[in-house]
Amino acid sequence: MFGAAGRQPIGAPAAGNSWHFSRTMEELVHDLVSALEESSEQARGGFAETGDHSRSISCPLKRQARKRRGRKRRSYNVHHPWETGHCLSEGSDSSLEEPSKDYRENHNNNKKDHSDSDDQMLVAKRRPSSNLNNNVRGKRPLWHESDFAVDNVGNRTLRRRRKVKRMAVDLPQDISNKRTMTQPPEGCRDQDMDSDRAYQYQEFTKNKVKKRKLKIIRQGPKIQDEGVVLESEETNQTNKDKMECEEQKVSDELMSESDSSSLSSTDAGLFTNDEGRQGDDEQSDWFYEKESGGACGITGVVPWWEKEDPTELDKNVPDPVFESILTGSFPLMSHPSRRGFQARLSRLHGMSSKNIKKSGGTPTSMVPIPGPVGNKRMVHFSPDSHHHDHWFSPGARTEHDQHQLLRDNRAERGHKKNCSVRTASRQTSMHLGSLCTGDIKRRRKAAPLPGPTTAGFVGENAQPILENNIGNRMLQNMGWTPGSGLGRDGKGISEPIQAMQRPKGLGLGFPLPKSTSATTTPNAGKSA
């Protein structure tokens, strides 16, 4: 564009006005481009006459913005709503602008013109389709009355219908409640549009997609010809009416309009407000709030905690397995086993009641146990199943000494070869098995067990086998000589296999002598 300054146009000064000439050339090129755009728009249907009123009102705004912000290159760039027609200079009186004015006047003879000045005509003509109604975006339109809309229903073109679809008529009611703002009355709308341009642009950016789906929800006189939402009611509705209107909306539309801080796409049906939408795994387990109560948001499903009758929970229905545990009546148990189980169960119940009362002297029970000689012996044991609990009670040591004294006295009065504390059944060993190991050793010294008391070999002190013994004679008949080893060559064993005998009741863990083997085999050379 600055290359055009080198050329000498007809009627222009050669020096001193180069800057003014380049500026004028820019404006001329810009006017030609806008005129071409206007002709293409008229070929597709042109502007409707309804927008001229809003254009004439917004012209002072555009003139002020043009003075303040300087010139711009093209009018169809993305600007603020008040920056659309700022490219022309009002003080330009050069002769180069006259052809452009003649061209514009000849071009607009077939249109209805409401403005007298060239600036207003240029601003109205150069307004692109994307910025047609930016000044009223976020506010209610100036031509929203129902009689005006009814007059223009029939003669709307396709181009006009596309523009009206994009218009945001009003704030959503839930957002207006959030911001605690009320809509201005009808008389103040023009004044607000002149004085509050910054807020108007903010509302334009935030409410681009807010009313895209309102033609589906609102019924009756509020819809005039496709997507145009024209409200005949006043804005002084109560909060109750607003809540009733919001309950009619679909849940995804509620979520898409609830957050006003994120911008969405302006394509039809495309909502990208992800902050208020839900994922597939969290689909609306809150929307059903009736009296019966839904399970996980599914209507009509009554949960189990509401389905059960509370009277059924109070009934003591006997559990057969639990009853069989209590009574000992298992199907696989024999009759004596059941009786023994019931006897032990009743005895344990009696012991628990006695443990609560803890008297000074604990009663003893005498159980007949068959002894090794054939006589019956009365065995003394403590009936307390939790005998080890006495070690942790305050009088544990004195009570244990009394039990030890009773056992020792009974052992001295009885047979010395019998044990006074021998246990023959599983439940009595349970009572005595809780004593410590040192107590068991002291008790065995006081009341020796039947059988050998010390470890030794079987037949250690036995007499040698006589030669007239039957076994000895059999071996001699087979070729064995006394004093030699067994076998054909006499290299076998010469002494009988030694069997280790341990004290009674100590079990397999008793330490054996290191020099001998612990295997217990029948003694071949022991005398009968």
UniProtKB/Swiss-Prot annotation:
Testis. This is G patch domain-containing protein 2. The modification Phosphoserine is found at S115, S117, S146, S195. Enhances the ATPase activity of DHX15 in vitro. It comes from the Eukaryota. Residues 36-119, 232-282, 487-528 are annotated as: Disordered. Residues 514-528 have a biased composition (Polar residues). The gene is GPATCH2. GO terms for cellular component: nuclear speck; nucleolus; nucleus. It comes from Homo sapiens. Interacts with DHX15. Residues 63-77 have a biased composition (Basic residues).
